[in-house]
Amino acid sequence: MLKQADIVVTNPPFSLFREYVAQLVEHGKKFLVIGNMQAITYNEVFPLIKADKLWMGVTIHSGDREFRVPDYYPLNAAGSRVDENGVKYIRVKGVRWWTNLDHGRRHEKLPLMTMADNIKFSKHKEVRGIGYETYCNFDALEVPFTDAIPSDFDGIMGVPITFLDKYDPDQFEIIANGDDRDEMEALGVPPLGPEYVGNAGRRKVGVPSTKKAAYKRLFIRHRTKATKGKKK
C-alpha cells in the first residue's frame, strides 16, 4: 500500500515516529503525519529538518488536541472523556503536523524588532528593560521567545524548539540541535561546570544568571544574501 500511495496522511504511534518517518523518506513519499513536538530534537529527525526535508504543517501550532481511542483504552489522563455515544477521547499535548509538502505559511517572513526595540518594548518581562544574555560556554545569544529574536543580530542564537512553528527557511538558517551532544562538541561547546547542578559535565549551553542549562534550544542565525537559498 505504501509503495502505491502518492501522499501519505496518517497518525502513527508516537513511539514509532522515528522509524515511520524514515520509512516514508526512504520510499520518497510525500506525507502529512501527526507527531509530537519533541520529535524536533530526535537524532533521526533533526537532520531532516536541518536539510530542509521536513517541516511543520499549516495547522496546529499550540495547545493540545483531542484524539479518539479504542474502547479498551484506559482513560487515566486529565482531559479524557466519553461522549454520549460511549466513544472515548483523550487530549494530547504538544502535537504537530509534520510534512514535506510545501505551503505558503512556511514562507511567511517572521516580523521582528531590533534588539534595542525588544529591550524597550518587548511584551516579555524577561527581555523588556533587561536585555539578552550570552551563554557561559558558547558565543551565542540566548533568546527565550521566538518573537523576541532581534532583527539586527547577525550571530548565532539559541531559540525554543517552538521556533519551528514560525520558521521561514529563506529568513533563517538552522545551525544545530542543542540536545545533540555531537553537534555541540562540533560547535566547540565545552561541558558545563559544577555550578550547573544537574547538568554539570554535560554539553549543554548554560545561562549565567540562572546557573541552569537552557531548555531544548535550536541554534539559528539570520540568512545573509550569501546564504539565502543555500541548503546544507
What are these regions (language model features)?
Residues 1-232:
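Class I S-adenosyl-L-methionine-dependent methyltransferase catalytic core
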